[in-house]
Amino acid sequence: MTSVLALETSCDESAAALVWRDADGRFEVSSARIASQVEEHARWGGVVPEIASRRHVEALPGLIQQVLDESDSTLAEVDAIAATVTPGLAGALMVASVTGRTLSALRDRPFLAVHHLEGHLASVHLAEHRPQLPYLVLLVSGGHTELIRVEADGAMERLGRSHDDAAGEAFDKVARLLGLGYPGGPAIQAAAEGGDGRRFKLPKGRISLPEGGFHPYDFSFSGLKTAMLRTVEAQSGPLPTADLAASFEQVVVDVLVERSLRCAMDHGLEELVMVGGVAANRRLRQTLEQRSNAVGVRVSVAPLAYCTDNAAMIGAAALLRWDAGARGCSLRTGVSARWPLAQVDQLYTEQPAF
């Protein structure tokens, strides 16, 4: 078995995990720990980068020790060390990156630089049921909403994306509009319980093609956000928060499910994988399961514990790289707030990508 100590500090979650992979390709998470900053950032209505970086510095060493202790392991017994290096908040990324590279140098262990989105894509491999390649991934999080085809050889092709707000970002902004607090995903889900999701008619944003018509797989949530603002402003008397939250949640779910299933069927893909923080949404999981069964598309969803940012998914991504032949990145590798997923292989070239 191969083991990796994985570190994640790309935004507001400090995380460490010890992940193993056996000869049959099965993953085992022997320990995974997260120190969340949600309550602290909630006071500001969103993530404050400087605060996030400071809290990562304070939390990460203790998380690493806790993970090793719970796994009854030591750094000397770990085969490699991995850390998220892109994309994310640059200052926050530096904490895991510098820590990981320092431990790699001190213990003479390979360092594996991981793209945060590659981590989300790998999270589904931590489920009991492993998806069968090729498949379509719906990556839906606070910063990204994309449809990605994954081939049998691991090659990836983006087939759809959001042209403005990501779905998770829209949840945060609408939650703020409704006075529900941060983070928006869980807040709207809770508020929508018992609400009428069909009471308010809201737009399903589409992207026009230059030659006419609409792109069948792309997303746009900015118009929906504006429509919610106008709907709220048009209300008189007490705000029907439950119905507003349910109507917003329902239209986002409908758009994500409809376009994902259409993309899968149009490309002859029999399995749809859903990952990312928004994949934790209960209505989305239930609706996708129901509608996929109706059209004969299998669905795999990342385990609930590994939908939001965590280090176990970073470890899984690193181990997939390891089994594909990667044996480490340059210790001169830095961090980047943005880096295309399509160029992730450049992290493993002799010359650091950044």
UniProtKB/Swiss-Prot annotation:
Disulfide bonds: none
GO molecular function: iron ion binding; N(6)-L-threonylcarbamoyladenine synthase activity
Binding, Fe cation: H116, H120, D309
Catalytic activity annotation: L-threonylcarbamoyladenylate + adenosine(37) in tRNA = N(6)-L-threonylcarbamoyladenosine(37) in tRNA + AMP + H(+)
Chief site of localization: cytoplasm
Domain of life, source organism: Bacteria
Transmembrane segments: none
Assigned GO CC terms: cytoplasm
Subcellular localization: Cytoplasm
PANTHER family for this protein: TRNA N6-ADENOSINE THREONYLCARBAMOYLTRANSFERASE, TRNA N6-ADENOSINE THREONYLCARBAMOYLTRANSFERASE, MITOCHONDRIAL
UniProt xrefs under HAMAP family: TsaD
Name of this protein: tRNA N6-adenosine threonylcarbamoyltransferase
Native species: Parasynechococcus marenigrum (strain WH8102)
